[in-house]
Amino acid sequence: MVLLLIAIGLTPAFKMKFWNIGAEGQILVGGAATAALMIYAGDSMPTPVLMILMFVASLAAGMIWGIIPAIFKAYFNTNETLFTLMLNYVAMQIVTFCIVYWENPAGSNTVGIINSATRAGWLPALGGLTYGWNVLIVLAFTFGMYIYMKYSKQGYEVAVVGESQDTARYARINVKRTIIRTMGISGGICGIAGFLLVSGASHTIST
């Protein structure tokens, strides 16, 4: 299911012909944001509040990681393939740095299962299904992305920019804004994939 969500996240970027090869990095920073909240706030917050914060934090982290190369592409016409690919390695180093402080047990060089005793921050079962929330969230994003790309004005702008930026400018579409917005959406969804991996599946994080 997580792979499907990643594919959904990449859809608008690829439709715009922005070759986002940085999904791995966006997933890692989203997962790291989720893990940080589970570790530092898991035992001090009500579960619903913690879940919302984890979801929002992973979304924001992924969006930031997606917007960075989009800004450089929009204003300096950098190569997005290389830029997003290199950001993957930056994200890996950030997670590796965090693992040093989060390792459990000490000296293991792994985070281990986060909150294994309390299960704080773990997505609960839904309808008796362990991964029920994962399925529901992915289905919601699948349907939402279909509506967004097929029927919304922004989805139309993505398609036009992907076909021809000159045509988009002629149609008075703000190309720079479309690139940045679309990569924010793409990165944000990939960040949520990191949330599902950490909170809803493995309950740990690694590179």
Label for each model-derived stretch:
Residues E80, T84-Y151, T178:
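Transmembrane helix-bundle core of multi-pass membrane transporters
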Residues G22, P48-I52, W122-N134, S206:
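Interfacial loop-to-helix junctions that mark the boundaries of transmembrane helices
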Residues L3-L10, G31-L37, S58-I64, N88-T96, ...:
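Hydrophobic core segments of alpha-helical transmembrane domains in multi-pass membrane transport
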